[in-house]
Design a protein with these regions (language model features):
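Aromatic-Pro/Gly-enriched surface loop or interdomain linker
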Residues: 1-22, 185-194
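General small-molecule cofactor/ligand-binding pocket signal
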Residues: 3-7, 131, 151
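Alpha-helical scaffolding within the catalytic cores
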Residues: 7-13, 43-46, 135-139
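Short catalytic/ligand-binding loop motif for oxyanion handling, primarily in non-cytosolic enzymes
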Residues: 15, 32-33, 66-72, 139, ...
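Short, well-ordered alpha-helix to beta-strand connector turns
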Residues: 19-22, 55, 127-128
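Structural motif
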Residues: 21-31, 59, 150-152
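A glycine-rich, often tryptophan-bearing local segment used as a flexible ligand/cofactor-contacting loop or short
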Residues: 30, 35-110
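Catalytic beta-strand/loop cores that center a nucleophilic Ser/Cys/Thr
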Residues: 85-146, 154-165, 175-198
Length: 198
């Protein structure tokens, strides 16, 4: 159970994130979903960084905050803990290739994980926890940023397992892991409904 609201980047600039536990930025570079040129606004960057740093949870799918600027492809790469290699830093070794096992988000996931078309050439920053990787391409990662957390996933086509992964990721980045099983089905093919007013 979650209350969902769609925010514009103007809403975010006006402080709308303050009323939320989790924000999702998902999509391919240059699309309205990812944000495109909106990420060329330092005020937007600062608002989102501040919100996460103070305890907000940020989820990125595909190419979140993608706008080539200041030597980074993901403007919020420091928050997500990942960035996309475009050839500018090929001479720099990326050593964070070790997969963390037993993470809360993947606790009941079964292989293979489905990223759809996914993303290639995503690499993790040194302190990022890599949850799934193939070769040198990071497909899933989490990162602490101040009091907040961020989660990155290379793609998120709809299926039962990805629904559960997203649900668990929302709880994780919001620091609400203990509330996960308040209304929860052990079988990922089932859903539970709760009507507190009835």
């Amino acid at each position: 159970p979650a209350d969902v609201e769609f925010l514009s980047f103007d809403d975010e600039l006006n402080g709308a994130l303050e009323g939320f536990d989790v924000a999702i930025n998902a999509g391919d570079a240059g699309t309205a979903y990812s944000g495109g040129k909106c990420w060329n606004n330092p005020d937007l960057e600062a608002k989102v960084r501040e919100w996460v740093y103070n305890g907000g949870g940020l989820i990125g799918v595909g190419e979140p905050s993608a706008y080539l600027k200041n030597g980074r492809y993901f403007v919020l790469s420091d928050v997500f803990g990942v960035d996309k290699e475009l050839g500018f830093t090929l001479s720099t070794d990326k050593y964070n290739l070790e997969k963390v096992s037993g993470h809360f988000i993947l606790e009941d996931a079964k292989a293979p994980l489905d990223y759809g078309e996914g993303m290639k050439s995503i690499y993790a920053k040194p302190d990022t926890s890599v949850l799934d990787i193939c070769g040198q391409d990071v497909f899933m990662a989490v990162n602490d940023y101040g009091k907040g957390r961020a989660f990155y996933m290379a793609g998120l086509p709809y299926n039962i397992q990805n629904e559960r992964i997203l649900y668990r990721a929302c709880h994780y980045v919001a620091h609400k892991e203990k509330l996960l099983k308040r209304w929860y089905c052990d079988d990922t093919a089932g859903t539970g409904e709760y009507y507190p007013q009835s």
